[in-house]
A protein has these predicted regions:
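Active-site microenvironments in enzyme catalytic cores
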Residues: 1-107
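Catalytic-pocket segment enriched in acidic/His residues
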Residues: 60, 64-204
């Protein structure tokens, strides 16, 4: 019943970085890594008065650049600015306290890597109520009509097992309690010296 310590959290991006299930997750040319992050997702909609309402939950792939993250802990925020995906199912009502799922990468139809993961409040460092409080206490996150997608974290990464994702690999994240798995291929943007060239800036 009391407010707990505030959690660490990072801004992922606006709605333009979300890709639909079965759609390719794009990796920018300047990226150092392309790593899945199998997570539970909470979806929230602010009403006309700015009051957040939890719509439900989904399976998510937060997707991050773990090489950039490890190079400098201050770059963790940078590493999160990547595409992501969630769905295809929406779980409404009470969330089971304990959830067991499987994260998998396939290559040319064969399983390259597979590992179980745990989620649900029984496996989280913070309660959902505490996470929600510390996010929506900021007025800018309570703008009427805004939709918020919260990725609640993971401890299971193929990167930790030295897996290097390649063009055309497919991520599959399953939580049986949610129904169908979330699946996305990965696509790398062209390396046409984009990473070495400064961004063109127009002058007003």
């Amino acid at each position: 019943g009391q407010v707990g310590a505030q959690p660490e959290w990072f801004y992922k991006g606006d709605g333009s970085i979300v890709v639909a299930p079965e759609t390719a997750i794009s990796v920018p040319a300047f990226a150092e890594d392309a790593g899945e992050e199998p997570e539970l997702v909470g979806l929230y909609l602010n009403d006309a008065n700015g009051q957040p309402h939890r719509i439900g939950y989904a399976v998510g792939n937060e997707f991050s650049d773990h090489i950039t993250e490890r190079a400098n802990y201050l770059w963790l925020a940078h590493s999160k600015l990547r595409a992501c995906s969630y769905g295809p199912e929406l779980l409404i009502g009470e969330l089971p306290q304990h959830l067991e799922g499987t994260s998998r990468i396939t290559r040319e139809g064969q399983t390259l890597w597979e590992k179980p993961f745990l989620t649900g409040e029984a496996n989280m460092a913070h309660s959902l109520a505490n996470l929600e409080h510390h996010h929506f206490k900021y007025a800018q996150f309570r703008a009427p009509g805004d939709l918020h997608v919260h990725f609640f974290g993971t401890a299971t990464l193929s990167f930790a097992d030295q897996i290097k994702v390649q063009e055309g690999d497919r991520f599959e994240i399953e939580l049986p309690a949610f129904g169908r798995a979330l699946r996305n291929p990965v696509a790398f943007e062209s390396h046409d010296n984009q990473a070495e060239q400064p961004s063109a800036m127009a002058v007003l």
